[in-house]
């Protein structure tokens, strides 16, 4: 009898590790599936942002330069109104959710509405003033400013490789600018201000999303809502509203289509920016934007109509583009290695707990 009890006891002890091992395998499989889904969502968000960002630059350039629409402010105003209208209808139909307006909302959103307004208007002004290749190469400065913003606001650090590739992009931009025959001081000033505001906006969006107070739809809605009246007032007092009303192209169906698309794309780009920042990071969003700019650079050279070719400018553009590609590769590689290391640490901790 004693022998039988000993055998049963040994069998039970032998089964425990097997069960533990099975549970651990199931946990690893579940984590792997979740990680695959997360990577897919990250790529989807990044791709959505890249396509949206590409389309809005092309459409805005067509409206402001090809059709010579006189008011960048009114284009920005149209984008704000479209954003508020779409999200208001979405909330009424219960497709999206975000908190109702109360006296605490301005505090929760600040300073994002101001950054959003400045980012949008300076982006439109610089799109109008600069040819597409120089517009895109000067946007490389947004990566440098994003690094500073994330370092200050989010306490992030960056590797030597990242810093060197950013340096290469900036050098390329300086080389290209040194022989830009279509140089426009106003355009250069607007694009550099836009770079600073883009960096600050990306870092603050990440910070606000992490706090989970308003959510991505709330941030989009209130950013646009709070800046409609100030933008309308500025457009009225500067005479931009009058110029827009007197514009002769309103009878052109193709112009109307592109103007409407520009307004709607403003909302889509805002949503894509927040989505990409939420699933990835402010820096990744900036990287995707710069990769998109590579395509715009070459398209702008051939089809833009306002690019003046010089070898120095062309070489500078390509130095900056090469830096962008290497930078993107290093950043994504480092991010994946970091996440893999974190996942392995979690598995090790769970494995020890199971044993």
From Swiss-Prot:
It is a multi-pass membrane protein. Disulfide bonds: none annotated. Ubiquitous. InterPro entries: Sugar_P_trans_dom, TPT_transporter. The chain crosses the membrane at residues 37-59, 69-88, 158-177, 187-205, 217-239, 254-276, 281-303, 308-330. Belongs to the TPT transporter family. SLC35D subfamily. This is Nucleotide sugar transporter SLC35D1. It comes from Homo sapiens (Human).
């Amino acid at each position: 009898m004693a022998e039988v009890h000993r055998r049963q006891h040994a069998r039970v002890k032998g089964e425990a590790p097997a069960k533990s091992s099975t549970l651990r395998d199931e946990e690893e499989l579940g984590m792997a599936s979740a990680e695959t889904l997360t990577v897919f969502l990250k790529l989807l968000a990044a791709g959505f942002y890249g396509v949206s960002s590409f389309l809005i630059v092309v459409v805005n350039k067509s409206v402001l330069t090809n059709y010579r629409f006189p008011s960048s402010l009114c284009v920005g105003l149209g984008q704000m109104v479209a954003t508020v209208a779409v999200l208001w209808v979405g909330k009424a139909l219960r497709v999206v959710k975000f908190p109702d307006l109360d006296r605490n909302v301005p505090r929760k959103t600040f300073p994002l509405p101001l950054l959003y307004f400045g980012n949008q208007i300076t982006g439109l002004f610089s799109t109008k003033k600069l040819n597409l290749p120089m517009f895109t190469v000067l946007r490389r400065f947004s990566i440098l400013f994003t690094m500073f913003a994330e370092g200050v606001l989010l306490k992030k650090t960056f590797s030597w490789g990242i810093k060197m590739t950013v340096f290469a992009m900036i050098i390329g931009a300086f080389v290209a600018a040194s022989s830009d025959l279509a140089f426009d001081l106003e355009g250069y000033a607007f694009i550099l201000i836009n770079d600073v505001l883009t960096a600050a906006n990306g870092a603050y969006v990440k910070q606000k999303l992490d706090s989970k107070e308003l959510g991505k739809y709330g941030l989009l809605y209130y950013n646009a809502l709070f800046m409609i009246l100030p933008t309308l007032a500025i457009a009225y007092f500067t005479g931009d509203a009058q110029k827009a009303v007197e514009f002769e192209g309103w009878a052109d169906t193709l112009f109307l289509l592109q103007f409407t698309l520009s307004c709607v794309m403003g909302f889509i780009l805002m949503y894509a920016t927040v989505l990409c920042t939420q699933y990835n990071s402010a820096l990744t969003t900036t990287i995707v934007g710069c990769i998109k700019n590579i395509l715009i650079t070459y398209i702008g050279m051939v089809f833009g109509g306002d690019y003046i070719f010089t070898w120095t400018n062309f070489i500078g553009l390509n130095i900056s583009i090469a830096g962008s590609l290497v930078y993107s590769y290093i950043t994504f590689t480092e991010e994946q290695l970091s996440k893999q290391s974190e996942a392995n640490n979690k598995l090790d901790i769970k494995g020890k707990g199971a044993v």
